[in-house]
Amino acid sequence: MLSYIKKSLVESNKAHKQLHIHNVPANMIVPFANDIDYTAVFAKIQKIIPSSLVNNVDVFYVVNIENFQRDNVSFNALYKDGAIYISPEQDSETDLIDDLIHEIAHSLEKEYQDEIYGDGNLEREFLGKRKTLYHLVDKPTLSMVNYNNAEYNKQFDLHMYEDLGYDYLRMLAAGLFYSPYAITSLREYWAIGFENYLLGDRSRLKDLSPVLYNVIYSIINNSEEYS
């Protein structure tokens, strides 16, 4: 994979002007499948994300990789080993912005581990919602033990995606989670919250998840541009 990216990067740099998001290079290994105004997208990301919050990202790649598939579910972006990989299969500029913000959120988890997870309050908020959801589900096919696990679990993910379905969960969990995908794991609860703090209905997020909201507020407002 790395040799493929390096070879493609040389060819890409010959054809395209080097792009950046806050001085982090953004490399087009594969062109977007749809007519995406990526320069406008990158400019918007720079406006809404303080530069100090991309310190853990070394490079952005637009490229196809195997990791965009997990358990027969497709993803459009991935943060791994200091790089954010972006699928060229983006429906719109809005989808691309969502994906970038979401993966930047994941890039912050190690640096801000104590602030996000250290006191356990965010996990308690998340699992409290999971337990409430369990009692709302009509004849759940998994036990409470599964709902009380904050980590990603393939069996639980399939239960959410296949047994219950996101449409059902969207209706059932509207008063608990900002979106059904936030139910997946504590890490996704964090990333969905960060994404929608910046792009969604901030007041709704605060009402639904006050602990999550306050963690995000603190990290963003204590970043160097806001200090």
Region annotations inferred by a language model:
Residues F156-S227:
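Pan-zinc metallopeptidase signature
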Residues S8, P31-Y38, F42, V145, ...:
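Intrinsic-disorder-associated interaction segments
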Residues N13-I97, G118, G128, H135-N146:
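Auxiliary, metal-adjacent structural segments of Zn-dependent hydrolase domains
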Residues S3-M28, N64, V73, R204-S227:
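C-terminal or late-domain output modules
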Residues F126-G165:
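Low-complexity, serine/threonine/proline-enriched polar segments
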